[in-house]
Curated annotation (Swiss-Prot):
Keyword tags: Hydrolase
Organism for this UniProt entry: Escherichia coli O6:H1 (strain CFT073 / ATCC 700928 / UPEC)
Highest taxon above the source species: Bacteria
Reaction equations catalysed: guanosine 3'-diphosphate 5'-triphosphate + H2O = guanosine 3',5'-bis(diphosphate) + phosphate + H(+)
Enzyme nomenclature, EC number: 3.6.1.40
Protein name from the UniProt record: Guanosine-5'-triphosphate,3'-diphosphate pyrophosphatase
Presence of the UniProt keyword Protein biosynthesis in the record: no
Length: 494
């Protein structure tokens, strides 16, 4: 029993899919062991009297039999099972739940829309980086949750009865992706939103985060098409035109859209367009977690840290036994360089955060081997779970670590889309120089330096006589100037 007592499971009986998340608590953080998702489409089994059909209930029970096998090893006090919109609505929900509890061997709780919204917000707060004041949007199968909050505290919570399955049945029942169907779906969604829009706007937000299958699908489409990961109304309208061009649901083909997500994509898209329009949202990114993560973190009683990224970096440093003093030393030199060139290069605050994060992890590759350490570092960062960092930011970190030394692979810096290619090049230059000047691993051996930028030309001024007193240092810097010149990055060192 010992090894399973640190396991926790969260199950969410959604209107479109049933999900199970099994995690292990490791040093105040969670490690995902299992994620199982089955499209049960429970909401599609509701008739006009809100009764669930026997077929839909059987689909649900069948899925729970799979989940039950995995739950046998976990203490019941460490399992939470919640049911959402469809089972809130269904007049015969009691029949479904009685049998579900029998199959799973633990209680199933039907939670209110507000409680669902609160849990979603907690899941986002624990796993998503960025500004503290946020609006969270989760489009489910039969309900849509909208929550504003600051840090761990929610300021307003709404659960609206519209979702991608119910809107599919209502506005795309004929499987026709015409303009009229989209117009009707958007108009109806805006009417549902209108009564709550003022309060959401009153509380306000600095960032907007999406936490649902629809937003996940959009992210996959944009990554597949090489776009940056920010969701904007313009991109949503382009995708709508693409869907209209396809004509029918069974013919819907968009690069990066999986068959599994395609069925409810147009209805989810219509709801999201309505939300963007009604609330005047400029830009949305994908959340790191939502309802299931909220359940798990709730069971673990872990507090929400102000800075998720810092917690992630600390955990990774401990796990891979990275020399934290050296990571801080490189970060300090890089920050000093960054602050000197930031105005000339018009860099944004997020770029500084990502550069410092790369410094914190730059030696992770040594945990595999000194040989090819940059390649090992890039592989690890690309494949590790890094709460607080978006997929595009992870890719940028991996690319910076790949190019921390040796000749520069310019194409890799251009293939990430977290920042413009030119910014990726600039961050790479600063990281490489910081690593060189902190390489003696002692604070008192880092020279006083000034770094000036004039367009792409970097001029580094060292203390008088430093180069003659440090022949190895001079050799390394000469080699670096040469490598930077190969990719047209002019570097002068005095």
């Amino acid at each position: 029993m010992g090894s399973t007592s640190s396991l926790y499971a969260a199950i969410d009986l959604g209107s479109n899919s049933f999900h199970m998340l099994v995690v292990r608590e490791v040093a105040g953080s969670i490690q995902t062991l299992t994620r199982i998702k089955r499209k049960v489409r429970l909401a599609a089994g509701l008739n006009s009297e809100n009764a669930l059909s026997n077929e839909a209930m059987e689909r649900g029970w069948q899925c729970l039999r799979l989940f039950a096998e995995r739950l046998q090893d976990i203490p019941p006090s460490q399992i939470r099972v919640v049911a959402t919109a469809t089972l809130r609505l269904a007049v015969n929900a009691g029949d479904f739940i009685a049998k579900a509890q029998e199959i799973l061997g633990c209680p199933v709780q039907v939670i209110s829309g507000e409680e669902e919204a609160r849990l979603i917000y907690q899941g986002v707060a624990h796993t998503t980086g960025g500004a503290d004041q946020r609006l969270v949007v989760d489009i489910g199968g039969a309900s849509t949750e909208l929550v504003t909050g600051t840090g761990a505290q929610t300021t307003s919570l709404f659960s609206l009865s519209m979702g991608c399955v119910t809107w599919l049945e209502r506005y795309f029942a004929d499987r026709n992706l015409g303009q009229e169907n989209f117009d009707a779906a958007e108009k109806a969604a805006r009417e549902v939103l209108r009564p709550v829009a003022d309060e959401l706007r009153y509380h306000g937000w600095k960032v907007c985060v999406g936490a649902s299958g629809t937003v996940q699908a959009l992210q996959e489409i944009m990554m597949a098409q090489g776009m940056d990961e920010r969701i904007t109304l313009e991109k949503l309208q382009q995708l709508k035109q693409r869907a209209i061009h396809c004509g029918r649901l069974e013919e819907l083909e968009i690069d990066g859209l999986t068959l599994e997500r395609a069925l409810v994509f147009p209805s989810g898209l219509a709801i999201l367009i309505a939300i963007f329009t009604e609330l005047n949202i400029q830009c949305m990114t994908l959340a790191g977690g939502a309802l299931r993560e909220g359940l798990v973190y709730g069971m673990l009683h872990l507090t929400v840290e102000q800075d998720i990224r810092s917690r992630t970096l600390r955990n990774i440093q401990r796990r891979f036994m990275i020399d934290i003093d050296q990571a801080q030393r490189v970060a300090k030199v890089a920050a000093n360089f960054y602050d000197q060139v930031e105005n000339e290069w018009h860099l944004e605050a997020i770029s500084r955060d990502l550069l410092i994060s790369a410094c914190q992890l730059h030696e992770i590759g040594l945990s595999v081997d000194f040989k090819q350490a940059p390649q090992h570092a890039a592989y690890l960062v690309r494949n590790l779970d890094l709460p607080g960092f978006t997929p595009a930011q992870k890719k940028l970190l991996a690319t910076l670590l790949l190019n921390q030394t040796n000749p520069v692979d310019l194409s890799s810096l251009h293939q990430q889309n977290a920042v413009p290619p030119r910014v990726a090049e600039q961050l790479c230059r600063l990281l490489r120089l910081a690593i060189i000047f902190a390489s003696r691993r002692r604070d008192d051996l880092v020279p006083e330096m000034t770094l000036q930028a004039n367009h792409e030309l970097l001029t580094l001024t060292l203390p008088q006589g430093w180069l003659t007193q440090h022949p190895l240092g001079k050799e390394i810097i000469d080699q670096e100037s040469q490598w930077q010149s190969y990719v047209h990055w002019p570097l002068e060192v005095h």
